[in-house]
Amino acid sequence: MYMSNPKNLLTVCLLTSTLITHAQCMRVHYDDGWTEQIAVGHVDSITFSQNEQHLAPTIMLNNGLQMPAFGIGTYSLKNQTCFNSVYTALKNGYRLIDTAYMYGNEEELGRAVRQAVADGICQREDITVITKIYPGTQFANPEKAIQERLDLLDIGYIDIMLLHHPGENDVKAYKAMEKFVEAGKIRSLGISCFYIDELKRFLPQVSIKPVLVQNEIHPYYQDTEVVDYIHSQGIVVQAWYPLGGRGHQSELLSDPVLQCIAEAHGKSLVQVILRWHYQRRVVAIPRLKQSCPHS
């Protein structure tokens, strides 16, 4: 789904929680790093850990670093539209931005991050930027591909770098990324579109455990077995197409069961879907479309 206003999306995420005072809460830590506050006496009520800026809640990764539990994807955003979109998203509280070599927008995204930091909107260390390298020539010559991502983004370091898909030389490419972690140029590593068989093959061959696996997840493609397996490895699950994948989006967003749930709780259907992800301990990154001019 496209979201035309990044502030609205973050707002609907936050409004889905049950608001209770800190004194009424106890904090629950899961082995996979996810943290929730549970209302004492009301175990079905969960509140986010929020600050006064209304930023998204954060989760602990398996390397001790933190990442927002909600973010935005930038697939299909190009040129000035990408700059405007990312800058506006940061201005409105987003701190998790996803891109990739294949999106062709890393340079504009990096420029927006630098501008937001220069304008005092946020600090660089508060932003999590994810990018990816792609199978084929980039896996065959990963050092070059990784350095190109660093140069195009030009934001000092990359927070999380992923392998976009499994493929020939994926272990070689990941091991190259590990060297960049050791050099301080990348902070965390991850993988995308990996399922149980690929994970069982891949994980024993690498030294640095991925902090996240980014897969297609939504109510019409729940993939519970895969999600549970990834969580069992102490790895965060991140959902692309969280509001419905190709061929499912319009159907999901008009689903009568979800509509009934939304009406019963006085929420929008999108709020219900995002809450579903959050309560499954899945990080949602809906795709953003925003073309308002930067000012």
Locations of the language-model features?
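Residue-level recognition of alpha-helix boundary/capping or hinge positions
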Residues: 1-3, 7-11, 22-52, 59
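N-terminal signal peptide c-region/cleavage motif recognized by signal peptidases
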Residues: 18-20
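N-terminal binding-site loop/beta-alpha segment at the start of enzyme catalytic domains
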Residues: 52-127, 243-244
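Beta/alpha (TIM)-barrel catalytic core signal, keyed to glycine-rich beta->alpha loops juxtaposed to Asp/Glu
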Residues: 57, 165-295
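Acidic-and-aromatic substrate-binding clefts and catalytic sites of carbohydrate-active enzymes
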Residues: 75-81, 100-108, 135-140, 166-170, ...
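Short, acidic/polar
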Residues: 78-90, 138-152, 197-199
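A short, structured active-site edge motif that brings together acidic residues
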Residues: 123-137, 159-166
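CE4/NodB-like, metal-dependent polysaccharide N-deacetylase domain
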Residues: 142-162, 179-183
